[in-house]
Structures are given as structure tokens and as C-alpha cells.
Amino acid sequence: PTCHWTGKPQVLQGIFQVGRRKYGFLGATDALPMQLRQVTVEACSTTYVLESPEARLTLQFTSPLLLDDLQLLARPITYIAITAQGRHGRPLPPCTVSLVADETLCLDHAGQYPVEYGEAVGPGFAAGTLASGVQEVLNRSGDDVRIDWGKVYLAVETGGRVALKEEGEQCAIQADRELQEGKQVLFALAYDEVEAIQYFGKNLPPYWKKERQTIPGLLELAFAQYPSIAQRCQAFSQDLQARAQAVGGDAYAELLLLAWRQVVAAHTLCEDEAGELLFISKECFSNGCAATVDITYPSSPLFLLYQPELVLGMLRPIFCYAQSPAWPFAFAPHDAGQFPLLNGQVYSGGTDPADQMPVEECGNMLLTTAAATVALDDLTFANTHWDL
């Protein structure tokens, strides 16, 4: 079964139907199992090759987390591209592929609130949507919790169909598309989180809304741009792999390819009221702390190499908090709040020195700020915060 990073169910299913036979290729289903033959991990994509007696299915997930394009990086859309071929020298029989995304993708847990189904159609795609009937944006923070506001989209390229699927009291989106021999079909998952974070009392929109975009508008772009985006992702992955192999060998390269999406996706991107970048991390099962300095420091080499402006976006919340009257100490905070609410530390309200890590966090802040200054060849950021 598919799940959230906390281990709680978030149901995605994939069904491949040939005649009356149904095969499951994604998530837990009642269909016949397909045999997994190959897995390939690249920086922005993971590709699976599966087989049934009648066909070979190639399934590729792509999240285009390219740091040289912040609008694309922030776009909350993941592609699922599927291709089928006949086996044993026989042509592919008539067949259909279906993806299902259920209400657990927009709730903390199944049945938490009633959900509302909708549809969106645009040039190049059709999408089904699910959203909680209770929309309390940024209503809570925590660790073992999942977003229960906003709206999830499951989209399929033009020629496909979307519909509401109901099983008992649970609702889901189902997207279907007929397959032809060797011809790729494209699906996409998207999420509108409405607001990204609360930043010292102010709700901030996600970066992808910077140009007044909507998810339907982004889906139109995403489907139209897929061939070039997929090409860019592959080129970047090949470059990263070659550079990593040159300095650390095959095993090191494999680790970097495996880690890329995990490291980058652990953040949300937005801007503060002054238009400065914020790149906010969330700790996993460690109080859910946001903008944690001892997360920023070890992850910074990736961003120093590929987009040092994002390192400044990681540091800004800590400097902002440390310079405010709310921070009583003469050393660096460990974090700026509990994701997605960056309103100051939640443990002891940031007032108990026993909860702090002054040597570690001051060292982390000094070294990371110095490294970003060198990477950008610019003293402006460091000079702005020199009094600290």
C-alpha cells in the first residue's frame, strides 16, 4: 500500500485492464499482481518495468525539482508517464490504464471530514479534484499530521476520462486512458495548498502563486511542457551522475541520485513580505520543527553547489527570529517554529535555555552564512546581519 512519509495511508492505486483481466501495478488492489522486472532511480525520476502475461508496462514518476528554475521547482505537480508493449512478439491487445487517488490525500485520515468532488478541464488535460468540506487553512502544526486543507488534483491528458469513485463512505478520483502499443500516456498529480506557511503571524502564499497562477493553469503548462521538462530532468540526472562518479565512484553516484528528491522536497518555497526567498524545511518525527539550523547545515552543500540563493532562504527565518524581541538569548535559535507555523519555538516558547543548542547552532549558522557568501561572491547578506 502507498503511504505518507509518516507511515499513514495515502491511497494511490494503478490498474491495468486487458479484456476482463485486471492487474494491479501501484498500491494495494484486489487485482492480479504484475511482476516487477526493473527499477531505475534518477535524480528527478523513478522508472518501473512491470509485466503481465499479455504486456510489459513502463511506469515513470517524475518530479522536476530543478534548482536553476524556481518556478518549475515550486510547481506542485508530479508526472506519471505510462507506456505499454505486447509480449512474446505479439501486438498489445486492447487495454486501459486507470489511476485512483482517494480522500486520504487531502485529509489527515480517511473519514476525518466529508469531502467534495469537482472537475477541471483545460487545454491538454482533464482533472478530478477532492477537497475537505472543512477548509481551515494552516489550522495546526505538528509532526505526525497531514495536510487537511487545500485540494488534490488527479489529471490525465486529453482523451482520458476522470470520474468520482465511491467505495462505502470513502471517495476517490479515478482517471482512465486507453493504451496503444509503444505510445506514452501522461497523468499528473497536483496539490493546491492555498497558503505555504505562517511566518511570524503572516500567512504567505506558495512561490508558485507568484505570477497569479492557479493549479488548472499550471496543469495546462505542465502537460504542454512535459517533453522538454522530461528531457531537462534526464540531462540533469546524467550530469549529476557523471560528476558524482568522477569524484566518488558508482556507489556514491547512486546515493546522490537516490537522495536528490528527498532533500529538495523536504522544503517549501515562498517569499517574505519584502520579496526575499524563504526555503523552509520540516523535520520528520523530531517535533516537526521548521527551518531547523542543524537540518540547514548538513543539507547546504547541495544547494551551495546548485542554487546558493536557496541557502539564504534557509537562513533568513533564523536571522529574523534572532533579531526579534521574541528571542531572549545571545546565541542562534535551533529553529523558527513548528511546520507550517513559523511563529517561534514551540517548546518552552523559546525561553528555557535547557532546550537550546548554542554551540552547535551558532557554529552551523556562521559556517553556512560564510559558505553562502563565498558561493555567491557577495557580502551583502552577511553584512545585513553583521550585528548578530
What are the roles of these predicted feature ranges?
Residues 1-53, 140-163:
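An extended acidic
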Residues 2-23, 109, 203-220, 321, ...:
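Active-site-surrounding "flap" and adjacent substrate/cofactor-binding loops of secreted or lumenal enzymes
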Residues 12-14, 55-57, 93-95:
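Short beta-strand/loop motifs in extracellular/secreted proteins, especially
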Residues 38-53, 252-271, 329-334, 383-387:
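An acidic intrinsically disordered interaction segment
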Residues 51-72:
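Low-complexity, acidic Ser/Thr/Pro/Gly-rich terminal tails and inter-domain linkers that flank the onset
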Residues 65-72, 83-291, 312, 319-320, ...:
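Acidic/polar, glycine-enriched structural segments that form the non-catalytic walls/loops
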Residues 74-79:
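Short, solvent-exposed loop/turn segments enriched in Ser/Thr/Gly
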Residues 181, 214-226, 288-388:
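Aromatic-rich carbohydrate-recognition surfaces in CAZymes
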